[in-house]
């Protein structure tokens, strides 16, 4: 049983770290996406932020008894590449990193075959420029990480 939804978040982070897609993969301790974006300039040129989102639970019931629950953790990724002095950052690298993240997480079971599945749902580019910091190209990606529970 994988009802530890923080485990789902940590497993995504570990999977991306092992893939070597970015110089740094981290789950920053921030309360808002804006705070996460503001912290990007403190990280290496290529970084992936892993941020928790909503939890959703669905239940299958037969004969008045629960037989299965699907626990989904929404995860938002900020996939970023910097280019010193370039407004908008290094979009080519950010695009390539996003493709590699998509390949790595698509239907990935995070080592829990039949119990967990990653389902990337959407991705979009976002350019960010700070006045006194290098430009950053950022892609946001939403991934649904689902745990299939049959024991309680």
Locate each region found by the language model.
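Compositionally biased, intrinsically disordered low-complexity segments enriched in polar/Pro/Gly
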Residues: 1, 151-152
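Small/polar-rich, solvent-exposed N-terminal microdomains that initiate assembly or binding
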Residues: 1-66, 108, 112-118
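Acidic-leaning, charged glycine-interspersed low-complexity segments
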Residues: 23, 45-49, 95-148
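Sterically constrained small-residue positions within well-ordered secondary structures
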Residues: 41, 66-68, 130-134
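Short, solvent-exposed secondary-structure capping/transition elements
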Residues: 59-60, 85-89, 114, 152
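Extracellular/virion structural assembly segments
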Residues: 66-70, 78-106
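Oligomerization/assembly interface segments of phage tail-like spikes and tubes
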Residues: 67-85, 135-149
